[in-house]
A protein has these predicted regions:
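Short coil turns that delineate tetratricopeptide repeat
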Residues: 35, 69, 103, 136-137, ...
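Register position in tetratricopeptide repeats
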Residues: 16, 50, 84-85, 118-119, ...
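TPR alpha-solenoid repeat register
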Residues: 40, 74, 108, 140-141, ...
Length: 182
């Protein structure tokens, strides 16, 4: 698994602004330098899916999963890809796997909730709804910290959590995250 210092910040901003062609160009440049760069593979899969280049998105995800087989966000992206290509059953299986690996993935919980509610599985829908509400109640930066913490990125998670606590010293969720990291 490669997590070197290739910069993905410009590509991330481009994705947030729905500039997927630009993002993909930046990410492909990164992947030329390091074809196993985890964040670049993930973001390239996201960009490709938004551009409806589903075969390319799948290739990026497959490469990503060969490097990081326990990355919940990769399974979430695989869920999105299957959803967008009309394969609902596979998408649900991938969303479930994503949530098992990383319980802080709000999009996966939302997809599971919608599926279970539509299929009249009340206990499962209630559980997904509870998870969704919990995740929606915390600030987005803490949700991000939870996600990367679940991926084992302890250093980044600790740094971001300490930054947040400097501005919000009484936030108990942030305190509990920092305790988990320690």
């Amino acid at each position: 698994m490669t997590e070197n210092k290739l910069d993905t910040s410009r590509a991330t901003e481009a994705i947030k602004d729905a500039r997927f062609v630009e993002a993909l160009s930046l990410l492909e440049s990164n992947l030329t330098k390091d074809p196993k760069h985890i964040d670049s593979l993930y973001l390239a899969a996201v960009s490709s899916r938004y551009l409806k280049n589903y075969d390319e998105a799948k290739k990026y995800i497959e490469s990503l999963l060969s490097q990081a087989p326990d990355m919940g966000r990769a399974y979430q992206e695989l869920g999105h890809l299957n959803r967008d290509t009309g394969n609902q059953e596979n998408s649900i299986a991938h969303y479930r796997q994503a949530c098992e690996l990383n319980p802080a993935l709000l999009s996966s919980w939302k997809a599971l909730y919608d599926y279970f509610r539509t299929n009249n599985n009340k206990p499962a829908a209630d559980h997904a709804f509870m998870q969704m509400n919990t995740l929606q109640s915390i600030p987005s930066v803490l949700l991000y910290i939870s996600q990367i913490l679940n991926e084992g990125k302890l250093g980044i998670a600790e740094e971001k959590c300490r930054e947040f606590l400097k501005k919000n010293p009484t936030n108990t969720f942030a305190m509990s995250l920092l305790a988990q990291i320690a």
